Amino acid sequence: MAKDIKYSADARVAMEAGVNKLANTVRVTLGPKGRNVVLDKSFGAPLITNDGVTIAKEIELEDSFENMGAQLVKEVATKTNDVAGDGTTTATVLAQAMINEGMKNLAAGANPIILRRGMKKATDCAVEAISSMSSAINGKDQIAKVAAISAGDDSVGEMVADAMDKVSKDGVITIEESKTMQTELDLVEGMQFDRGYVSAYMATDMDKMEANLDNPYILITDKKISNIQEILPVLEQIVQSGSRLLIIAEDIEGEALTTLVINKLRGTFTVVGVKAPGYGDRRKAMLQDIAILTGGTVISDELGLDLKEATLDQLGRAKSVKIQKENTIIVDGEGNKAEIEARISQIKAQIAETTSEFDKEKLQERLAKLAGGVAVIRVGAATETEMKEKKLRMEDALAATRAAVEEGIIAGGGSAYIHASKEVAKLAAKLEGDERTGAQIILKALEAPLSCIAQNAGLEGAVIVNKVREKKTGVGFNALTEKYVDMVEDGILDPSKVTRSALQNATSVASTFLTTEAAVASIKEPAPAMPAGGPGGMGMM
């Protein structure tokens, strides 16, 4: 396919037009008075959203050079979303400001390579200033405020804070579409895995078809149990203690299963058998998780342990276990707290090291099960269009909250960038030539998010920026009430991680954009002409 090539200013100007088209579409959503964007879908109803990355991903421009510029800025939004889960609009606005300001300096004869160096130094300085302003998140109230600012909805903030409060910061919170108009929170406490009883006759509640065991012993093994003689010694100890038993094994079959069911029906003792969750190495890891959670030992040939010699000391304990046809939930395992913490740290280290998204997801599930449980937020709305919009807001809010827990919070509403710019200004004064110009590009770009928030509220951005710059650190502009307030006290909070990532990713793409000296694009082939129609019919003849 033939290519079209543009050089220097021609290439950059064409790409800048694409950057502006994408950024101007995204920037209308920023701030408490930001609007929504309607996205046409090839099937189904249009999607209405204020999520920067969702909008950016939909944009493809007809002109190849403009499209290249748009795709570069799309990468800013995507990368920020991957790292922090929120702040995609802010990142796009920052990148646009840097590119527009940088283009003016290139036209005036600045060297892009040295500009880039100055931009990098200024960004590092701003990131340091943001980190120094950051403070740890305190309590459920601040979590709710972070989520509410991200979603632009206080009720969303409350629900995310409730979910996080109940399952701890390491718990899994999933967001699903509800079948009703109500948005509700469901909580699964303890460790849940998707394996149920091996026989329906083991149910203790025949109406609900589930088995409920209070303070049971838990036998954990990776073996297949088919001969009752293998577990007879431990069963005798269970009967003598008058307790109930949960067996988690690779499988329970044949004579062993028959004997357990008959004794359960006769009322001799209550034993429920469950197949071990997972497969292969993941099964071994999950059995070990259950053992650590309940204070038991995995009876395995690898450890030189035999079922016939198992004692009550090697069995786990839990406050209660609920077993359904396809699910088992272990609540309040009696494992050693220090060992559970050590296991959690080990899984976190594995999450940090793995590059596979699938492995990461499975490890996070294991982490949540050990750390506290699973919360499900079911998003309800009157129409599917509204539901999808609410779900996207909820996902952003959850990501922002996780980022806040991870790296702390700072004053929101773009004010942190203004106060960080005071440090960047000091740095710029020490630099010379095009390096100083590069730092000044960042200095100017740091004003863009607050200016954009003010513009979306129908106000003059430059005036608001100058007034905030005169205030002490932590004071900013509340675009909803149009007052200058202490942002943290007023509940306008941003996660430090989101603020930092947005700036770093914007600088990365903008500085690369400015060093572009040629652009190569495919020449689009014209669509083939419609073939001629066939000859006419005989008509009425």
From Swiss-Prot:
Source domain of life: Bacteria
Signal peptide: none
GO biological process, one term: protein refolding
Any one cellular-component term (Gene Ontology): cytoplasm
SUPFAM superfamilies given in the database record: GroEL apical domain-like, GroEL equatorial domain-like, GroEL-intermediate domain like
Residues involved in ATP binding: T29, L30, G31, P32, D86, G87, T88, T89, T90, G413, N478, A479, L480, D494
Catalysed reactions, as listed in the record: ATP + H2O + a folded polypeptide = ADP + phosphate + an unfolded polypeptide
Pfam families xref list: Cpn60_TCP1
Database matches in InterPro entries: Chaperonin_Cpn60_CS, Cpn60/GroEL, Cpn60/GroEL/TCP-1, GroEL-like_apical_dom_sf, GROEL-like_equatorial_sf, TCP-1-like_intermed_sf
EC number: 5.6.1.7
Keyword Lipoprotein: no
Gene Ontology MF: a single term: ATP-dependent protein folding chaperone
Intracellular or extracellular location(s): Cytoplasm
Protein's UniProt keywords contain Methyltransferase: no
Keywords: ATP-binding, Chaperone, Cytoplasm, Isomerase, Nucleotide-binding
Subunit structure: Forms a cylinder of 14 subunits composed of two heptameric rings stacked back-to-back. Interacts with the co-chaperonin GroES.
NCBIfam families: GroEL (TIGR02348), PRK00013.1 (NF000592), PRK12849.1 (NF009487), PRK12850.1 (NF009488), PRK12851.1 (NF009489)
Function: Together with its co-chaperonin GroES, plays an essential role in assisting protein folding. The GroEL-GroES system forms a nano-cage that allows encapsulation of the non-native substrate proteins and provides a physical environment optimized to promote and accelerate protein folding.
Family per record: Belongs to the chaperonin (HSP60) family.
PANTHER family, A to Z: 60 KDA HEAT SHOCK PROTEIN, MITOCHONDRIAL
Protein name in the entry: Chaperonin GroEL
Gene name, Swiss-Prot/TrEMBL: groEL
